Amino acid sequence: MGYMVKLIYTQCKNCGYEWVVDQTIYYMKKYHDMVLTKTYFKPARFYVGDCNTIFNIAYDGIAWCDTPNNIVTKPSNSLKVITTSIWLKEHMEKKGIYVEQVIPRGINDEMAKKHVNFDFNARRGYVIIARNLPYKRIDNTLKMFEGKRKELTLISDHSNADFDFFSLSEDVKYYLLSHALFYIAVSDAEGFSIPPVEAMSVGTPLIYIKKHTYKEYGCGIEMDSIEDLRKIEISKEEWEDLSYKCWYKSLRYHYITVGQELWDWFK
């Protein structure tokens, strides 16, 4: 198969969307021998970003977008829209926006394979990866760990973070995810949140709040409110069962699968 060069746009530098673009470039080359070129400028063939932003700047091509916010902008008739979750697809369709396909964000296959860990005894505590934004509810989570802060590993740009969100390597991030008993997922809104699925990919179950945010991909222990964190109890056998189930569910989000779906749009 010959090289096929396409421009793929990221709406920002040093952000989650650029991470998605970089992962897509790497894995499309690895699995499909397809060369994609990152750009910060339009026009492009393929746009990655927040739906409201992309709909305002892209007039044709393909938008692979998500958003934690209400959709307030409509795309041009020439722009084909791919989104990252069934919930977002349904939300857009209610706004009169046609969605071509649902393709979730992919995880880092290589790191997941390297760090997958089903050993209950090699794990302790809880982990969360989140930007310091109100809807991420970091302060609420920290409050639940008052008096037992050492049990929580917080990866964030929050002032009380254990590791900085922006400087942590992929290798260290996946190592930390694979040595926690649970990943805490309590955000009020997401387009498609990658870190919880990254946790699942190394065998770490989620403790997640009962919201549309996690309905589609959540795996682990569902709770009604963040206060229920205080009530979590689980045996070794129950945890091991959840660990395997969550790992298995995460396979749908590996780039070997996601990339095959994207290939049809890049070819």
Curated annotation (Swiss-Prot):
This protein's record includes keyword ATP-binding: no
Signal peptide from the UniProt entry: none
Annotated protein name in UniProt: Putative glycosyltransferase 63
Family to which the UniProt record says this protein belongs: Belongs to the glycosyltransferase group 1 family. Glycosyltransferase 4 subfamily.
Record key words, sorted: Glycosyltransferase, Transferase
Record EC number: 2.4.-.-
Source species taxonomy: Viruses, Adnaviria, Zilligvirae, Taleaviricota, Tokiviricetes
Molecular-function GO terms, alphabetical: glycosyltransferase activity
Enzyme class: transferase
Superkingdom as given in the UniProt entry: Viruses
